[in-house]
Amino acid sequence: MSKVKKNDETLSEVLVDVNRVTKVVKGGRSFAFSAYVVVGDKAGRVGAGHGKAKEVNEARGKAKQAAKKRMMKVPLYQNRTIHHDVVGKSGAAKVILRRAKAGTGIIAGGSMRAIFDSLGVHDIVAKSIGSTNVYAMISATFDALNKLASPKSIAMRRDKKVNEISVKSADIQVNE
């Protein structure tokens, strides 16, 4: 995960979740708002953040700042999908991300769709298993995105050329 600084003008912001939270004190109840925001540049960079304040707009602003601090770069295949299938986990939430053919679209639920829109992915199939909690699903999705690697980065890590590690299905021979 590499930290990235971008201008506010180029970032898209999606408010994923807003909750009213309560703190019980001696004099009664104290209300505040909790917000979860996803930001991205639609070109391979995305981040998510959480903010809490007395007003919704303040909570949203804090969440946006936290999301910008946590922005990460994700390698994309042809700037439309991911390079390989991957699984991410966070607590009881588990997400499976699968690459898709051109024209498939984003097949994903709620908060995952917001992440992929902000990331700039156009074709992906995502399945969530277990917990449907927004925070857990976003965390699991980011865990999966952190596991993604491009063939170029894998080749560099192994001190090989890209064509040595990329195996096409036609090149695999089956012994019958």
From Swiss-Prot:
Gene3D superfamilies: 3.30.160.20, 3.30.230.10. The keyword Disulfide bond does not apply. Residues 11-74 form the S5 DRBM domain. GO terms for cellular component: small ribosomal subunit. The keyword Ribosomal protein applies. GO terms for biological process: translation. With S4 and S12 plays an important role in translational accuracy. Located at the back of the 30S subunit body where it stabilizes the conformation of the head with respect to the body. HAMAP family: Ribosomal_uS5_B. Belongs to the universal ribosomal protein uS5 family. The N-terminal domain interacts with the head of the 30S subunit; the C-terminal domain interacts with the body and contacts protein S4. The interaction surface between S4 and S5 is involved in control of translational fidelity. This is Small ribosomal subunit protein uS5. It comes from Rickettsia africae (strain ESF-5).
